[in-house]
Design a protein with these regions (language model features):
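ER/Golgi luminal nucleotide-sugar-dependent glycosyltransferases, focusing on the catalytic module
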Residues: 1-310
Length: 310
């Protein structure tokens, strides 16, 4: 059995549910700022960049894993986003994620998050486990009409980052990692987005991705207005993650399994049986209402936005 570690980036201000198996490794993101006595491992030990949490987001956890943990496979998930290991296909949201209200024992079983043997069997067959792609046209800011991934990201100019940051990223790729430049151009000219920084990779690929991402993210932080756009380096990291995966698939022909990404609206711990069953009833009711409402008021449609303002 391979040593597989999926690092789950946790917020320091929320006591989130964890998946307690040998595979999942919860880590507090930005733990250097945490004044609590949490038992969850922090990203502030050993070689770390924990203090950059506000700009690098979950990448401080990725960096910590790279520098401080030895494994055969490295994965990254988010306290509200997990890769599904179920063979069943579930209905997606506009961002091509499955939506669940809570993370409970029921959901862990449903998506086989608690099945260590199953996860091992799946992961060892591939170089990478990655989320299914999302259409760039469905992820633009304010539902702006876009055709390419570049146009999608540029719709966030002045929202998530300053104008010109994408050009800066391309220049840095050409300077620091020119072997990825053509793949970057091809990926950004395409119609699909590999979003949310969730994946599992063989150690070799994980190390190569880190060596690709962090030098560019560090330079972006040096030349970008991070006071206004604090999380800009993190968004660049997400773009670089997609570029790296695209390169591995199209240039090196690496094997990959695409699986659904599950988004949990609320992952705060449930402390009683009464609260658990209340959540289950709420989840069933929410699904029933959405099955009707989403057809009448599609996600991010002008009609839906007007109703939300009432």
């Amino acid at each position: 059995m391979s040593n597989i570690r999926i690092f789950v980036s946790h917020r320091i201000d929320i006591d989130s549910e964890t998946v307690d198996t040998p595979v999942y490794f919860p880590v507090r993101c930005g733990a250097v700022y945490d004044e609590s006595n949490s038992e969850i491992q922090g990203d502030d030990t050993g070689d770390n960049i924990s203090k950059l949490r506000m700009s690098f987001c979950e990448f401080t956890v990725q960096y910590w894993a790279w520098k401080n943990v030895d494994a055969d496979y490295y994965g990254l998930c988010h306290y509200r986003r997990y890769l599904s290991f179920s063979d069943k296909h579930y209905n997606n949201t506009a961002f091509n994620m499955v939506r669940e209200l809570r993370l409970t024992a029921h959901e862990k079983k449903k998506y086989h998050l608690d099945d260590t043997q199953r996860i091992n069997n799946v992961v060892q067959k591939y170089d990478m486990i990655i989320p299914v792609v999302a259409k760039a046209s469905e992820m633009s800011y304010n539902r702006a009409e876009v055709k390419t991934l570049r146009e999608m990201w540029e719709s966030y100019n002045g929202v998530y980052f300053e104008q010109g940051i994408i050009d800066n990223m391309f220049s840095l790729i050409k300077e620091l990692s020119p072997e990825y430049y053509n793949s970057a151009c091809e990926y950004f000219s395409g119609e699909y987005h590999r979003a949310f920084n969730c994946y599992i990779m063989k150690k070799e690929l994980f190390v190569r991705m880190c060596e690709f991402q962090f030098p560019i993210m560090n330079r972006i932080m040096e030349i970008t207005d991070c006071k206004t756009y604090e999380r800009a380096p993190g968004y660049i990291g997400e773009m670089l993650n997609g570029i790296f995966i695209h390169y591995m698939l199209t240039v090196e022909n690496r094997s990959a399994k695409e699986t659904q990404l599950v988004f949990f609206v609320n992952t705060e711990k449930i402390n009683s049986a009464k609260e658990y069953y209340k959540c289950r009833i709420h989840a069933v009711a929410d699904k029933a209402v959405r099955s009707v409402a989403d057809k009448i008021f599609p996600m991010y449609s002008p009609r839906r936005e007007k109703v939300k303002k009432l």
